């Protein structure tokens, strides 16, 4: 609801992305962090002293999270790790104090199961230390918030930055990914409702052939359809958020049920938002292409939840396998 309100206010994806990593990226830390880690980090994250970013995605692995190549090698002394590798599409890395990092601590060819061998860390992003470099990525939308490539070259971190058990990072990080999908769904809804509000206002104000264009069913019906899609997606999103929250204390809720709900919500909200944003541009006609009316910005930004943090096709694969019990296709 918070993320929906932010994007719907006109702040769009940039407004939401400025803070959303502080919410979802810290979920695994809050659940699996030690007492000392929580006392050091959580109060400063809550009061705004520290910002966080989520260091998972890599340029050569994409959705194959289990094939991540960034390594965390424990040094001979045992009191530190050396990080080497590259992350990409890391939002707010330019301003973040902390990164929730997923890195490989056991080579993939040595693990007994594919989900083993990755570890999660909560590390300082000390730009004055050797071994850390960042490069901004020029984006189509949401330009008020930075997205980055982050390079590690023997970047040293203390051993006590490890969150949870070594080699169990993939299981831990999943607790942040479901939260991320819920947040992206809320952000998509906000964009869709903001675009729809602009479209209906224009459809009421714009007069052609002696009457408002919204009086024509060719304008009214697509907007009504977009509204119903947003409302349905909102219900799915709120259901997913409630299920995610409940699962934290109710062990009877299957983990995959939460995943299905959160992924479905992200998919439905992203599609509903795209429909609303596209129709808002078309309702404005030629002026929809003008920056003055803002709807072109909403259309650019609504592509983000369609693409990230997981593609539409992979969500369909996931639901096909987990719900419909169909053979895995990838």
Regions found by a protein language model. Give the residues of each.
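Long, acidic (Asp/Glu-rich), low-complexity accessory segments flanking structured domains
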Residues: 154-172
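A structural signal for short hydrophobic beta-strand segments in well-ordered beta-sheet cores
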Residues: 70-74
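Alpha-helical interface subdomain recognition
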Residues: 1-10, 16-19, 32-37, 44, ...
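A short, Trp-centered hydrophobic/proline-enriched beta-strand micro-motif
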Residues: 47-56, 102
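Active-site-adjacent elements of ketosynthase-type condensing enzymes
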Residues: 59-69
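Short Ser/Thr-interspersed hydrophobic loop/turn segments at strand-loop and sheet-helix junctions
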Residues: 2-7, 102-104, 123-129, 153-157
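Flexible, small-/acidic-enriched active-site or ligand-binding loops
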Residues: 127-156
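A short core secondary-structure module
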Residues: 79-133
